Amino acid sequence: MSRYRGARLRIVRQFDLKQTLRGLTRKRTDNRCMPGQHRKKRNDSTKKTKNSKKVAQYQIRLQEKQKLRFNYGITESQLINYVRQARKTKGSTGETLLQLLEMRLDNIVFRLGMAPTIPAARQLVNHGHIVVNNKKVDISSYQCQSQDVISVTKNKTIRTLISNFINSKTPKNLLRNPQIPSHLIFNKSTLLGTIKSVVPRRWIGLKIKELLIVEFYSRKA
């Protein structure tokens, strides 16, 4: 399954989220109808069947998995690989999975406030504008470690672009830039960020039930 490149608010409406997928889009929406031509109501009654409970449980797990995938902008195969990697690590599989995704370079650039969304941060990385420990890294899935130093290349145009975004006022129709989490340090004047430690669970950039995702992949990954 390829990476999603379609309408982003459509995904937010699909999940009926009161808070948007912050990594995917900054835009707000008050439209609570399902996306599509006929705008199906969410509370429409459906006939109960013997398998309705089983289907409902599967649907809940699937939705949590899709929320995670869309927020971080990863493919299905990438997510499966992260789940397998998390299982090999000691501790909670769900929490380790979230930490692996949070420590991706594109997400770190986003959480430092240098880009409005994770896709925008991924562009900065892929185009070679991000430096890790004084070495240019153009792989968005690069796994950052504690004490890594993240900076921007000496390209004046890019540095000006990032500085203007950081210092700009947020329009009313967009969400404000999120607070920089406790495990990161960022100097706005030098555009220099440092990773102090692995991200704590309470600073994960998405409200999600990771246990449901682990259960979803219990027989697949």
UniProtKB/Swiss-Prot annotation:
PROSITE patterns: RIBOSOMAL_S4 (PS00632), S4 (PS50889). InterPro entries: Ribosomal_uS4 (IPR022801), Ribosomal_uS4_bac-type (IPR005709), Ribosomal_uS4_CS (IPR018079), Ribosomal_uS4_N (IPR001912), S4_RNA-bd (IPR002942), S4_RNA-bd_sf (IPR036986). GO terms for cellular component: chloroplast; small ribosomal subunit. Residues 103-161 form the S4 RNA-binding domain. Residues 37-53 have a biased composition (Basic residues). Keywords: Chloroplast, Plastid, Ribonucleoprotein, Ribosomal protein, RNA-binding, rRNA-binding. SMART domains: Ribosomal_S4, S4. GO terms for biological process: ribosomal small subunit biogenesis; translation. The keyword Hydrolase does not apply. One of its GO terms (molecular function) is structural constituent of ribosome. It is found in: Plastid, Chloroplast. Residues 26-53 are annotated as: Disordered. CDD domains: S4. Part of the 30S ribosomal subunit. Contacts protein S5. The interaction surface between S4 and S5 is involved in control of translational fidelity. Belongs to the universal ribosomal protein uS4 family. HAMAP family: Ribosomal_uS4_B (MF_01306_B). One of the primary rRNA binding proteins, it binds directly to 16S rRNA where it nucleates assembly of the body of the 30S subunit. This is Small ribosomal subunit protein uS4c. It comes from Pleurastrum terricola (Filamentous green alga).
